[in-house]
Amino acid sequence: ALWEDLGTARRVMVYPYDFMMGEAASRGIREVVRYYAVLSLFLAVLTPLVNIAGFPSDVVHASTNAQMGAYHYAPKMEQITGVSRHVWTGLLTFLLMLVKLPLFVAFLHVFSKLLGGNGDLGASLRLVVYPGTPAMLLGWVPFSDFIFGLWVGFLYVPALRYLHGIQWGKAVAFVTFLMGLQILYVVLTGGGWLIEP
């Protein structure tokens, strides 16, 4: 199953338009959720290992909101429990990836409808999961994490177009707005959540 998921990830990242036009819509809900869980676990295991190796883990070096939250709360959990912040970083990353999934699906479903989209909740699930592939698969890579977050933004455009039928211009404008908010958030909070490796 892991090799199949890695093959899917490669197709999403290398052939995003072809994938979103065809294969993405044909995937069942269980398959999409399993893919998301496997890649989330992959991210949750590798993120703290890279931190232990001495690379920074702060909000600027996070590809996902789950990593940002984990970096913020892991030191606090370490103080409360005595368990290493690196263990907490992994656990919290995975937990927050799972918690955020239905929230992001609901958020993007509502906004897709407001933009004139015609997809159902399954399309919104695929809209969250498949464009998130670069951040989930590669978001642990030192000093390039933010780049993978931007890659996710790039993949949202064809996903909005092909999974919800949203016009290209609206899809680009919406994604640009969301990425602008994310960049502003990073700029405003970037120095405050540093975890020393």
Language-model features: locations:
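Selected alpha-helical membrane-embedding segments in polytopic membrane proteins
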Residues: 2-115
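C-terminal TM-helix exit segments that contain a strictly Trp-centered aromatic cap at the helix terminus
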Residues: 46-55, 143, 184-193
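Short, highly charged low-complexity linear segments
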Residues: 53, 72-79, 163-171, 193-197
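Functional transmembrane-helix hotspots
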Residues: 53-62, 149-152, 191-197
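Hydrophobic alpha-helical transmembrane segments and adjacent short intramembrane/lumenal linkers
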Residues: 104-189
